[in-house]
Structure formats: C-alpha cells, structure tokens
C-alpha cells in the first residue's frame, strides 16, 4: 500500500494512496540545529502535520496534499517543545495548487506554493533554499529531513527533526515498486536499495536536497517505510520552476507542465 505522508489528528489514513505527511525520517539521526534552516513546520489545531521549504523571504513550497483549512507555519524550529530565540510564525496569505491538477489523482502534481502573510527575516536558523538550477542525476546523494515517524511500523514522532542521506534512484525502481505510478507524473525516486532509510509518516511536504540543490518534495511511499524495493517518491521541483517563478512574478493563472 502506498503511504501518503500526512499527520491528521495523529491518525494514518490508509487509503488507496496513503501520503507521507505523518511520516518521519527512518534510519536517520537527529539533525544538527543548523542543518535544516529552510525547513518549515506546519501546525493546525491538533498539532504538527506537515513540512515545507522556504524558497525566499515570502514564499514556501510544499506538497499539495498538505493543504489544510487553517494552519500556521513556523520557521527556525528545532525542538517542538523549546522555543528558539529567532523562531518566526507566519500564516498563509495565498495558496497556489496547479489549476490543471487532476483532483481524483492524489499523486498528480503534488505541489503547492504558499505566499506568507509577511516577509521572513533571515537569521541564524532561518535561511531560504533556492530553486534548482539543473535537474538531478541518478546516483546523486540526497539529504532528507523532518519530524516524521522514526520507526517504520509503530508510529514514533520525535520532538526534533531527523536527517538522513539516501540516493537518487532510477525511475524504473519506483515504477516496479508502485505499478500505479504513471510515467507522466513528474516525480523522483529516492532511497536505499537495501532499505532502512526513508522518509515516513509526517515528513510530507519536506525537501529532498541532492548535491546541495532543492530537487524534490516528499510526496508518498510504502507502508511500512524503509522498504528497499519501494523507495520514497518525491515531486520533481525542477520541472515546476517556470510555474513557481511565474506565480511569484504575479502571473497567477499559469498552468503546470503536463
């Protein structure tokens, strides 16, 4: 079963696709406090439920399946229980999902751009991560991070984000693991073939950083997490560069690539 990685009232909703917004990094270690300065934590009335990535002082990029009616975004967070001096909280001013997204296909165009209600000030623990200048190559070393579950079956949510390194795999690996993953979906396949390292429930919307560039958004994967032949699937950011840049420039009617 594909796991959509989202936290909703601490329940994993097992649907035909279960996305990762409730998942944590499996097989990782606690992130260094300065290792995730672009990582954004999403909170609603029930608590943490998704992540995003700050791409400039006014915009955050996340997964479309992380959309929620009422939520706040916290930047500069490490421990969810201990306030950082430079931590900042923002609300969404505008949210943009691909107008040509197929609503009945949760895996299609799983990307959302959020304009903040006010600009973020860069600080010791808050620094934006630029959009990629080129697409990633198979074999690239990629960095994953998040507050998602750190155990693959029984959900265990950490107080601090966990980080791990995985590899960008050939798309054929994910096509074999997920026959329902259509070839036209603009996604990346990343993990460890022997298993044991993966994003998991609660990590949805967070970044996949390959060779220092922001290349992917946590979208979905298998349950249990960390299965070698069923790696994580990530929205391919590079393919959406034009859509993202057009919206930021004020062209809010632009469509996403098919």
Curated annotation (Swiss-Prot):
Enumerate the glycosylated residues. 44, 251
Instruction: Note the coiled coil stretches, chain numbering.
Output: none
- Molecular functions (GO terms): serine-type endopeptidase activity; toxin activity
- List where in the cell it is found: Secreted
Summary of the tissues where the protein is detected: Expressed by the venom gland.
Q: Which GO terms describe its cellular component?
A: extracellular region; secretory granule
The record's keywords, sorted A to Z, are: Blood coagulation cascade activating toxin, Disulfide bond, Glycoprotein, Hemostasis impairing toxin, Hydrolase, Protease, Secreted, Serine protease, Signal, Toxin, Zymogen
Which EC number(s) does UniProt give?
3.4.21.-
Give the transmembrane ranges: none
GO BP terms, alphabetized: proteolysis
**Origin, by domain of life?**
Eukaryota
Q: Which InterPro entries match?
A: Peptidase_S1_PA (IPR009003), Peptidase_S1_PA_chymotrypsin (IPR043504), Peptidase_S1A (IPR001314), Trypsin_dom (IPR001254), TRYPSIN_HIS (IPR018114), TRYPSIN_SER (IPR033116)
Q: Which residues form the propeptide?
A: 19-24
The catalytic site is made up of 65, 110, 204
Q: Subunit info? A: Monomer.
Described purpose of this protein according to its UniProt entry: Thrombin-like snake venom serine protease that shows strong blood coagulation activity in vitro.
Q: What is this protein called?
A: Thrombin-like enzyme saxthrombin
Q: Which organism is it from?
A: Gloydius intermedius
């Amino acid at each position: 079963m594909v796991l959509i990685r989202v936290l909703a009232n601490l329940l994993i909703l097992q649907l035909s696709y279960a996305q990762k917004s409730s998942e944590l990094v499996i097989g990782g270690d606690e992130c260094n406090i300065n290792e995730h300065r672009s990582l954004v934590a999403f909170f609603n009335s029930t608590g943490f439920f998704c992540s995003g990535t700050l791409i400039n002082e006014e915009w955050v990029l996340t997964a479309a399946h992380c959309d929620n009616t009422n939520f706040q975004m916290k930047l500069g967070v490490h421990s969810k229980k201990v306030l950082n001096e430079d931590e900042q909280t923002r609300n969404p001013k505008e949210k943009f999902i691909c107008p040509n997204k197929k609503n009945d296909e949760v895996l299609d165009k799983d990307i959302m751009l959020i304009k903040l209600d006010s600009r973020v000030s860069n600080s010791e623990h808050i620094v934006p991560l630029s959009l990629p200048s080129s697409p990633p190559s198979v074999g690239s070393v990629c960095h994953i991070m998040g507050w998602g579950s750190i155990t693959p079956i029984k959900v265990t949510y950490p107080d601090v984000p966990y980080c791990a390194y995985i590899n960008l795999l050939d798309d054929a690996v994910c096509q074999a693991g997920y026959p329902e993953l259509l070839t036209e979906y603009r996604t990346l396949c990343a993990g460890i073939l022997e298993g044991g390292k993966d994003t998991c429930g609660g990590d949805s919307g967070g970044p996949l950083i390959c060779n220092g560039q922001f290349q992917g958004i946590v979208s979905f994967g298998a349950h249990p997490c960390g299965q070698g032949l069923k790696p994580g699937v990530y929205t391919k950011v590079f393919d959406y560069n034009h859509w993202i840049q057009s919206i930021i420039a004020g062209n809010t009617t632009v469509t996403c690539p098919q």
